[in-house]
């Protein structure tokens, strides 16, 4: 199967990508899990550094991302720029506040001391829609990565370029290799990913 993004205004092809086979998808999940094993032990202040860098990349390239959204799914150019900038704000926000949000909470019980602690889950699958192709992903990815998780993304099939651009942002920002990956798969393959023993 080939994924092809079509400019909705002109009907012309923008790009095309081959669907990943299950063996490749499984390998990506395993690589993401390996990256997670180190990332989960990374202090919040160190997790925040690449997330803030991701925010800066989004700002610096907001016009490029706005153009990509316009080409793949028809979002007005200025709205795409605003969406990229909103994603940057989310990156900054979670980089600055995640440690406070995830601090252990003391609770009253009969025990000498009781508390709730928040621990990373592992590799988290995100299945995302096309209408806000950057925002829907970053509103998941920014807090998920700051919480110490890894992420794999199955984006809508009409915005493959956006999906790969987002993966590249996390790479360029300096996150560990394979911590966030895009899966080029169709909807029928999602259940197989959900059932993978390393996906949480």
Regions found by a protein language model. Give the residues of each.
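Rossmann-like NAD(P) dinucleotide-binding subdomain of oxidoreductase/dehydrogenase enzymes
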Residues: 107-200
